[in-house]
Amino acid sequence: LDNNLPTLGTRMESTWAYMTELAASTKYFDYIEYEAEYAPYTEPDLENICRASELYGCATVIKVDRQNRYYNAQRAIACGASGILFADMYTAEEVKETIDAITTSYPGGGIFGRPNRRLGMNGTGRMRMSDYRKMTDDVVKMIMIEKVDAFKNLDAICKVPGVDMVVFGPFDYATNAGWEMDKNAKDLDEVHREMIRIALENGVQPCVQLDYNTNVQYFYDLGVRHF
């Protein structure tokens, strides 16, 4: 993100860290996304997933539920996650509150206290507070755009300080709009393209999750660099 370079990730629902290690060891992927919204897990599971990714210089993104997102996101960051993907957002106001929850409580910052876990391990036994601030600031904040209201509020959401990326969720969007995936495929494509356009106009990177690589060029031509 800092160097405007493309990224490629893959998704996991298994807590078996060996599966994460297999994916990361291919060197094909820049990040592994663990779907904590769907799969059961413990905090040691998240630590092991992050460790397995780190073995091969791979980042880890954790997707969290809406209801308990503050707690789960804070714990995921403490476990070593490089990014958090927040599901089921609706308004810019709640996005701001969500970003504040994982931003260190420095003057003018958020409400996140010192996460004394893997995040704070730098080999010295004592990390400067400014280092904690930088580490939490560097966590990639990603927002799912999968509700009709979120799409309507997209311009304002993209203007929330700290929002790095947005991701379209076609299945949830179709459900929320009262659509069907097959009958309203063109409508969903139109919303997706418009999401990409609005995000890029605001300097926020769209991330597109694909089941197949056949559409990569199409989205690349729209300005997407993260898959």
What does each of the following model-derived ranges do?
Residues 5-9, 30-31, 57-61, 82-83, ...:
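Structural preference for beta-strand elements that scaffold enzyme active sites
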Residues 10, 35, 84, 98, ...:
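Conserved, mostly hydrophobic/aromatic
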Residues 20-25, 62, 67-82, 86, ...:
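Catalytic cores of alpha/beta
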